């Protein structure tokens, strides 16, 4: 299967915050499912991350505007249930 053909097999909602959920939240705020879809659409090999935390630092939306994120956690507890977790 080609990389561009990767589709999720299932989806669930996040129950509690983790570093993985934090990064998924950032991708979904920018309009992508996750890092896999972002890399497919934008044709990039690496995503800008904060070296201290490993969280996503900057994402380019589909309309070519940029989202910039802080080093600290941005996904509040009340937002966690909105994050979709895709399984491939």
UniProtKB/Swiss-Prot annotation:
Xref: InterPro entries: Meiosis-expressed_gene_1 (IPR020186)
Keywords: Differentiation, Meiosis, Spermatogenesis
GO CC terms, sorted: cytosol; manchette; nucleus
GO biological process: manchette assembly; meiotic cell cycle; protein localization; sperm axoneme assembly; spermatogenesis
Inactivation phenotype: Mice are viable, but males are sterile, producing only a few sperm that are morphologically abnormal. Spermatogenesis is dramatically impaired at the stage of elongation and condensation. Spermatozoa exhibit failure of flagellar formation, disorganization of sperm axonemes and deformed heads.
Any Pfam family the entry gives: Meiosis_expr
Family: Belongs to the MEIG1 family.
Role noted for this protein: Essential for spermiogenesis.
Oligomer status and interactors: Interacts with PACRG. Interacts with MORN3.
The protein's name in its UniProt record: Meiosis-expressed gene 1 protein
Annotated source species: Mus musculus
């Amino acid at each position: 299967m080609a990389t561009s053909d990767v589709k999720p097999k299932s989806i669930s909602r996040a129950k509690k915050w983790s570093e993985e959920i934090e990064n998924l939240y950032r991708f979904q705020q920018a309009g992508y499912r996750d890092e896999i879809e972002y890399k497919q659409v934008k044709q990039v090999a690496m995503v800008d991350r904060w070296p201290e935390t490993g969280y996503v630092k900057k994402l380019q939306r589909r309309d070519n505007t940029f989202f910039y994120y802080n080093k600290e956690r941005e996904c509040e507890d009340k937002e966690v249930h909105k994050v979709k977790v895709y399984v491939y």
